[in-house]
């Protein structure tokens, strides 16, 4: 069995959003030394869209001489049959699970197109999500410290420690209103909590990161700058972590964690409940 890394075309295909296909595909491919060239085809509901998809799968096979990987979810039987005739390896992301659930609960599935998160059916959920995203964007990177009473959580940390992507993920996936505030170089000489945070201590949560990883991230943004130097990163992290300990603020190290893992660990540590599923 091959162990060295290989490149492979990967298609995520659905007659819905294809988000489930992408999510499962990323998890599965993360177990292998594969460098995926990914293409997503959502809402494949017409012959025209399916024909274009089949052309791209065929082109991939002819160009590389190996079958691409296709993670898919298709409800319409005729379109599913046509898709499976293409030169590819296919992985139905729901079939085995749906069949098992059907057997366990003794009920036949009734699949429908785009069933999940319909705006008409779940309008309250939809608008809650939008409100959470808007609030989080308005409070990103210390832009605003107004309306902190509406925040579910306030993330603190040095610049580039993962606050913004974590905030947006928690807003989009969990419906949480997230504030994030960066401590910058000018804060290090007299590190303290802002007065605005004193009444919201129970919402504070810190993110930290290894100095080597932080240096690497900052070098990609501002190579050769003092901001990106390992010495500066070490100093900022030591100062901020000392603040977290002094003020009894819970924090985690994000160095080897994905955004999904960071967000889930925050929920676990704080006891926050998801508003959306």
Swiss-Prot record:
The entry's keywords: Kinase, Nucleotide-binding, Serine/threonine-protein kinase, Transferase
InterPro entries: Kinase-pyrophosphorylase (IPR005177), PSRP (IPR026530)
Spans through the membrane: none
Binding-site residues, ADP: 157-164
EC assignment: 2.7.11.33, 2.7.4.28
The keyword Transferase is assigned to this record: yes
GO terms, molecular function: ADP binding; ATP binding; phosphotransferase activity, phosphate group as acceptor; protein serine/threonine kinase activity
Catalytic activity: [pyruvate, water dikinase] + ADP = [pyruvate, water dikinase]-phosphate + AMP + H(+); [pyruvate, water dikinase]-phosphate + phosphate + H(+) = [pyruvate, water dikinase] + diphosphate
Pfam families for this protein: Kinase-PPPase
Family statement drawn from the similarity comment of this UniProt entry: Belongs to the pyruvate, phosphate/water dikinase regulatory protein family. PSRP subfamily.
NCBIfam families in the cross-refs: PRK05339.1 (NF003742)
Entry function: Bifunctional serine/threonine kinase and phosphorylase involved in the regulation of the phosphoenolpyruvate synthase (PEPS) by catalyzing its phosphorylation/dephosphorylation.
Name this protein carries in UniProt: Putative phosphoenolpyruvate synthase regulatory protein
Organism: Vibrio cholerae serotype O1 (strain ATCC 39315 / El Tor Inaba N16961)
């Amino acid at each position: 069995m091959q162990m060295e890394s290989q490149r492979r075309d990967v298609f995520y295909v659905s007659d819905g959003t294809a988000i489930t296909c992408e999510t499962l595909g990323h998890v599965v491919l993360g177990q292998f030394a594969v460098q995926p060239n990914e293409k997503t085809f959502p809402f494949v509901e017409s012959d025209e869209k399916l024909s274009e998809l089949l052309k791209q799968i065929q082109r991939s096979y002819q160009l590389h001489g190996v079958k691409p990987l296709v993670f898919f979810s298709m409800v319409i039987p005729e379109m599913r049959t046509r898709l499976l005739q293409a030169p590819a390896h296919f992985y139905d992301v729901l079939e085995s699970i749906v069949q098992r659930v059907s057997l366990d609960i003794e009920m036949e599935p009734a699949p429908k197109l785009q069933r999940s998160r319909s705006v008409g059916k779940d309008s309250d959920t939809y608008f809650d999500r939008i409100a959470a995203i808007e609030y989080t964007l308005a409070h990103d990177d210390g832009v605003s410290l107004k309306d902190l009473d509406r925040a579910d959580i306030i993330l603190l940390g040095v610049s580039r420690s993962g606050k913004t992507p974590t905030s947006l993920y928690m807003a989009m996936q969990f419906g949480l209103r997230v504030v994030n505030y960066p401590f910058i170089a000018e804060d290090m000489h007299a590190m303290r909590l802002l007065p605005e945070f004193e009444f919201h201590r129970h919402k504070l949560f810190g993110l930290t990161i290894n100095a080597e990883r932080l240096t690497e991230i900052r070098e990609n943004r501002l190579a050769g700058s003092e901001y990106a130097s390992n010495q500066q990163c070490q100093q900022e992290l030591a100062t901020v972590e000392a603040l977290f300990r002094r003020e009894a603020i819970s924090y985690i190290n994000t160095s080897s964690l994905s955004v999904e893992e960071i967000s889930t660990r925050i929920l676990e540590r704080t006891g926050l409940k998801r508003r959306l599923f």
